[in-house]
UniProtKB/Swiss-Prot annotation:
Required cofactor names: [8Fe-7S] cluster; [7Fe-Mo-9S-C-homocitryl] cluster
TM helices/strands, residue ranges: none
Keyword tags: ATP-binding, Iron, Iron-sulfur, Metal-binding, Molybdenum, Nitrogen fixation, Nucleotide-binding, Oxidoreductase
Amino acids binding [7Fe-Mo-9S-C-homocitryl] cluster: C267, H433
Enzyme class: oxidoreductase
Residue numbers binding [8Fe-7S] cluster: C49, C75, C149
A Pfam family annotated for this UniProt entry: Oxidored_nitro
Record-stated family: Belongs to the NifD/NifK/NifE/NifN family.
EC number: 1.18.6.1
Name of the protein described by the UniProt record: Nitrogenase molybdenum-iron protein alpha chain
Role description: This molybdenum-iron protein is part of the nitrogenase complex that catalyzes the key enzymatic reactions in nitrogen fixation.
Catalysed reaction equations from the record: N2 + 8 reduced [2Fe-2S]-[ferredoxin] + 16 ATP + 16 H2O = H2 + 8 oxidized [2Fe-2S]-[ferredoxin] + 2 NH4(+) + 16 ADP + 16 phosphate + 6 H(+)
Record gene name: nifD
SUPFAM superfamilies per record: Helical backbone' metal receptor (SSF53807)
Length: 477
């Protein structure tokens, strides 16, 4: 069996089932990597909570809603866009202009629960805060309210409060019941967000206009402008993005997703749920798509073009974009060929990126890992990895250090929480969740990512640093 127990895990042997060494001799699907389970006590990992999954991923990118976090101040601060960059434009689907650009990145409201609220309940305080927030920001089109661990434990009824406030204020007030402890990872928050939006919003409004080429772009959160890259491709193909879920989206777009002709699911871990539900109830089919790297981007633009009879337009976009990026791709491949890389993403990016990085940059992917991926995602990592690649679910800090020592990656694509840990080990790191200098999607985005990888590896600062095993004065001499 190709499972592996790392040296640092001798006291938590359960970790063996979470760590896999790729061996193509094993029958496909024979080794089911353990994942999406509670972190083992004593294993210090980098996961986020269910609240982070719903607010930090699913709803945080919507441009015209106000977020009210029912919590002590810590959770409110945590939910204030600290890990993602979700820019928005002020233009609205009906041609109007939202009064505050990047409103979703600038404002969040919390109930600032105290010990007294925990003892006596915080529902009256929540109502007061929603009323005050509505007066302060009367132009928002909806208010989203979030449960957290504290309010989940004391049993505050957010649904009842939101129903009352919606009737009073005359606008949608939506409760998202994903307290941090609701699941083992942020993935539970994705799930709750999908189902809440579908049950409470989808089908409740009609779009200003429709066309025969309308799509929902689901699981695209416009990290550092990713959506705007894809929007340009679709515009050139004559395809209209009717609704986004949820990058640069409006509240209304979520309500009329049922009117699209096709849904495209980009982040397949966080947003396939809502696409399935829309298909089941409204008959809107969906395609799972991948726009990371030139080959996958071209394949999926062709698939969309074929669905709408826009094959010629798709080929024109692919040809134009490849001609623009090929010289830069050739340069970065010449500089990065053979460099060892570890892709440590939250979920799908670990299998989205492994092949393009090998194919177009010539790099050697020695390790893959995920924080909240499910079994199907790890199967894709295993399929796309070469023999000998280590694949880790929910890696802890000591495991990361051991993998660096044994596999010697020259760069890590990871998150902000791990970035400076790897720096202390002398390994450059590029943020793959929220990016360094994005966008990273599509043809031009892949070049941006290659540039950031090149810049990180060849940064002359690394030559000026010494990484010692012992601090001065720690010797026993």
């Amino acid at each position: 069996m190709p499972f592996c127990l790392l040296d640092v895990d001798k006291d938590i042997p359960e970790r063996e089932q979470h760590i896999y060494i790729k061996d193509s001799k094993e029958p496909k699907g024979h080794c089911k990597q353990r994942c999406n389970t509670n972190t083992i006590p004593g294993s210090m990992t980098e996961r986020g909570c269910a609240f982070a999954g719903v607010k930090g991923v699913i709803t945080g990118a919507i441009k015209d809603v106000l977020h009210v976090v029912h919590s002590p101040v810590g959770c409110t601060a945590y939910g204030n866009g600290t890990t993602k960059r979700y820019p928005t434009r002020p233009e609205m689907p009906d041609g109007s202009v939202f009064p505050v650009e990047n409103f979703n990145l600038k404002h969040i409201v919390g109930t600032d629960l105290t010990e007294s609220d925990v003892v006596f309940g915080g529902m009256n305080k929540l109502k007061k805060v929603i009323r005050e927030a509505s007066k302060e920001f009367p132009f928002v089109n909806a208010i989203y309210v979030y449960a957290t661990c504290t309010t989940g434990l004391i049993g505050d009824d957010l649904d009842a409060v939101c129903k009352e406030m919606q009737a009073e204020l005359g606008k949608d007030v939506v409760a998202f019941n994903a307290p941090g402890f609701a699941g083992p990872t942020q993935s539970k928050g994705h799930h709750v967000g999908n189902y809440t939006i579908f049950e409470k919003l989808v089908g409740t409004k009609e779009p200003p206009k429709t066309t025969d080429y309308d799509i929902n772009l689901i699981g695209e959160y416009n990290i550092d402008g990713d959506y705007w890259v894809l929007e340009k491709y679709f515009e050139d193909m004559g395809i209209n993005v009717l609704s986004k879920f949820t990058g640069d989206a409006t509240h209304g777009e979520l309500c009329w997703m049922h009117k699209a002709k096709l849904s495209l699911v980009r982040c397949q871990r966080s947003a396939t749920y809502v696409a399935k539900l829309i298909e089941e109830k409204y008959g809107v089919p969906y395609l799972k798509v991948d726009f990371f790297g030139p080959e996958y981007c071209a394949e999926n633009l062709r698939a969309v073009g074929k669905y709408f009879g826009k094959e010629i337009e798709a080929e024109a976009v692919i040809k134009k974009e490849m001609e623009k990026i090929q010289p830069e791709l050739d340069f970065y491949k010449s500089k990065l060929q053979g460099k060892k890389i570890w892709i440590s993403a939250g979920g799908p990016k670990s299998w989205h990126l492994s092949k393009p990085i090998e194919q177009y940059l010539g790099m050697d992917v020695v390790a893959l890992s995920g924080l909240f991926e499910h079994e199907d995602g790890y199967e894709k990592m295993q399929e796309r990895a070469k023999d000998g690649t280590i694949i880790i679910d929910d890696p802890n800090t000591l495991e990361m250090e051991e993998v660096v020592e044994k596999y010697q990656p020259e760069i890590v694509l990871g998150g902000i929480k791990e970035k400076y840990f790897f720096h202390k080990l002398g390994v450059p790191s590029v943020m793959i969740h929220s990016y360094e200098n994005g966008p990273y999607i599509g043809f031009e985005g892949f070049v941006n990512m290659a540039r950031d990888i090149y810049t990180a590896i060849y940064n002359p600062a690394w030559k000026l640093m010494e990484f010692e095993e012992e601090e001065p004065g720690d010797s026993n001499e």
